[in-house]
Structure formats: C-alpha cells, structure tokens
C-alpha cells in the first residue's frame, strides 16, 4: 500500500515524476519516482509506511497537472487461472469498497488488455459483492485495478471524490459531426474537468457572451454556440459556414493577441499555437483587466523541461494577479484530448455576479 501509481499521456512520464516528487518534497514524504519512457504510467515509491496515504490525503487530485489517474497500493502477480481467489486474498487488508474500476494503460499493450478486462469485470464484481468486499456506496473508497498484463496488476485504492472523473482519466466524449474540427473535444472536456456539472446552467448559460481567439475553423466556437452564447470569433482564417449560419457568431479578421472587446465578456477561449510565455501574457491581460470573467486557454509546451515551464508560468500568473490585488482561481490540467499542451482554466472571483 506504499506505492502511488499514476496514469498519464504516453511520453509525459517524466513530467509526472517531476511533479509528484516536488509535492512529496514539499510535504516531507520521502521516496522516489520512477517510470519507463512511453509506458503511460509512473510510480512514486514511498520509503516510509503510510507515505502514499499521506500524499493522497494532503493533495487534491484535480490540482495535479500531468497525472490522469492515481491510486495507492501495490503490484500483484496473478496465476493463469483462478485470478479472482488471489485478488480476494490480497484485498483482505483493504477497506470495503464502494465502486470498482478495471483500468488499462494508454498504450498499445493496454488497448489489447481492454477486452480481457471487460470479460473479467463481471465475475470479479460478483465475487467481491458475495465476499462483502464491494457495496453500492459512493462515499466509500474506490478499488482501482490497473492491469499491466493479464498476469500483473496494480491493486490500488483511491477516494472517489479525490481521483479521476473517469476510468483511466479518459472521458467518453462523442465527436459531434457538425463540429468543424476535432479540437472541439478539448473544450468540451475542459467544461467537464473544471466546472461542476450542477453549475453549467449558471456559468455556461445561453444569455452569455464569449470570445474565441484564434478561432478558425471554429472547433472551440462550436462549443460556445452549442451552449447558446453570442460569440465573437477572432481569426484571419475562415470560419465554418455552419457556425456563421447560426446567427450567433460574429467573425472579425484580426490578431488574437492584440484585439480586445469594447465591453467585458463572460468567456474567453484560446487555442492559438504560440510560445507559452506569450500566451500567459495574454491571460494576464484578459483576466487582469477584467475583459472576461472566465477563460479556458491552452499552453503549448516546449520540448524540454515541460513541467518546470508550466510551473513557472502558473506561479507567474499567480504573482501577477496578487500584485494587481485581484482574486483569480487558476487550474491547469493536461486533458486526455490535449497533445503537447496543457489546458488552463481561470476565473475572476471578485467580480459582482451577473
């Protein structure tokens, strides 16, 4: 139970190790991080009993940037037959669980295991329920079984309210056929990640205004229009006719880094390919000068020192807003639909309600 196991995007194992090591050092939890390149996972092995539990207790999962999912526990080797009996014996010292997720890694090997997991879940679930190890109770911890192979599994536990929203941290979003580009799924995932579902009507309402900087062809604009917002799309490139036909979009041929609205808007979204430091300056201007209430902005990452650069820019934003004496909440996550980038959500907390 003294290893913290984390899923991530393939190629970002080093960023997960750097991030969790920094948090562990700050909290005084001794141990070491390890990973294999392109494995889509990383581990933090705690050297003291209770270290992994303390990390999960002190950290909020939604404040971590690069991990997609986490659980504390240990690896178990399974026989070719009667895997369920071995798992039941391993779970004797675990608490009673309120839910069960079987997970695989986001790799070719992981995809090959997904069929096995689907077939294995039904008999395993029945056996756990019969043994009194699994009950229908959302307040109880979640049992997370991350299969590395059919014979090797990480048996882990995580609080349901302090871990990923979806198995493996991968949302099941359907690409809308009428959307102009697949990038639309990035913004839809961001809504789920950063805004509690019960607040959507209030914060993503059809009486709101939005700006999409670098909008062409309209993947992110589509999400704003879908919520019924009036949108100003800023881009020198063309917009999809289907969006213009809605009557909700005004397309202005302008530079997303210099254009500003005459009146403050509710939302600013931006997915421009640019150096992250310049995009950070854009965020500081829009939130700092009250040009928008909330924003979702993607930061494109450098090739090296990616976690260090993201951390530096987030700290810079925080210092900038503090110096301006304004209250802004800042969240950042590498979403499943992100590539070499992270998504930031910012919200002014000191403006009067609409």
From Swiss-Prot:
Q: What is this protein called?
A: Ribosomal RNA large subunit methyltransferase M
Protein purpose: Catalyzes the 2'-O-methylation at nucleotide C2498 in 23S rRNA.
Note the InterPro entries from the entry: RlmM_FDX, RlmM_THUMP-like, RNA_MeTrfase_FtsJ_dom, rRNA_MeTrfase_M, SAM-dependent_MTases_sf
- Give the positions the UniProt entry annotates as the active site: 300
**Which residues take part in binding S-adenosyl-L-methionine?**
183, 216-219, 235, 255, 271
Which Gene Ontology cellular-component terms appear in the entry?
cytoplasm
Reaction catalyzed: cytidine(2498) in 23S rRNA + S-adenosyl-L-methionine = 2'-O-methylcytidine(2498) in 23S rRNA + S-adenosyl-L-homocysteine + H(+)
Q: Does the keyword rRNA processing apply?
A: yes
What GO molecular function terms would the record report? S-adenosylmethionine-dependent methyltransferase activity
Q: Could you say which protein family the record assigns here?
A: Belongs to the class I-like SAM-binding methyltransferase superfamily. RNA methyltransferase RlmE family. RlmM subfamily.
Q: Which residues, if any, are the signal sequence?
A: none
Give compartment(s). Cytoplasm
EC number(s) reported in the record: 2.1.1.186
Quaternary state and partners of this protein? Monomer.
Gene3D superfamilies linked: 3.30.2300.20, 3.30.70.2810, Vaccinia Virus protein VP39
Q: Name one GO biological process term.
A: methylation
NCBIfam families reported for this sequence: PRK11760.1
Keywords annotated in UniProt: Cytoplasm, Methyltransferase, rRNA processing, S-adenosyl-L-methionine, Transferase
């Amino acid at each position: 139970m003294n290893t913290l196991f984390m899923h991530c995007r393939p190629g970002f194992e080093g960023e997960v190790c750097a991030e969790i090591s920094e948090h562990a050092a700050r909290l005084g939890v001794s141990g070491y991080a390890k990973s294999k390149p392109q494995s889509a996972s990383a581990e933090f092995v705690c050297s003291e009993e209770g270290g992994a539990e303390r990390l999960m207790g002190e950290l909020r999962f939604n404040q971590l940037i690069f991990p997609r999912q986490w659980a504390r526990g240990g690896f178990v080797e399974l026989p070719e037959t009667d895997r369920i009996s071995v798992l039941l014996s391993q779970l004797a010292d675990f608490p009673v669980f309120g839910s069960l997720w079987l997970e695989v890694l986001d790799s070719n090997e992981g995809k090959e295991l997904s069929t096995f997991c689907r077939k294995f879940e039904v008999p395993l679930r029945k056996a756990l329920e019969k043994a009194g190890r699994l009950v229908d109770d959302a307040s109880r911890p979640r049992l997370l079984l991350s299969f590395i192979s059919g014979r090797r599994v990480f048996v882990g536990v995580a609080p349901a309210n302090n871990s990923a929203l979806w198995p493996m941290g991968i949302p099941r979003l359907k690409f809308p056929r009428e959307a102009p580009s697949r990038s639309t799924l990035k913004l839809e995932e961001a809504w789920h990640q950063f805004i509690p579902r019960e607040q959507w009507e209030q914060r993503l309402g059809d009486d709101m205004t939005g700006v999409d900087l670098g909008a062409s062809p309209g993947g992110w604009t589509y999400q704003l229009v879908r919520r019924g917002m009036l949108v100003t799309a800023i881009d020198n490139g063309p917009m999809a006719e289907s969006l213009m036909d809605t009557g909700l979009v005004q397309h202005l041929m302008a530079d997303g880094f210099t254009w500003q609205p005459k009146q403050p808007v509710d939302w600013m979204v931006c997915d421009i390919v640019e150096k992250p430091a310049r995009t950070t300056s854009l965020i500081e201007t829009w939130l700092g000068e009250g040009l928008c209430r909330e924003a979702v902005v993607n930061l494109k990452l450098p090739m090296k020192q990616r976690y260090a650069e993201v951390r530096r820019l987030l700290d810079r934003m925080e210092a900038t807003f503090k110096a301006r004496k304004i209250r802004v909440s800042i969240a950042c996550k590498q979403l499943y639909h992100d590539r070499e980038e992270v998504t930031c959500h910012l919200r002014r907390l000191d403006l009067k309600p609409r």
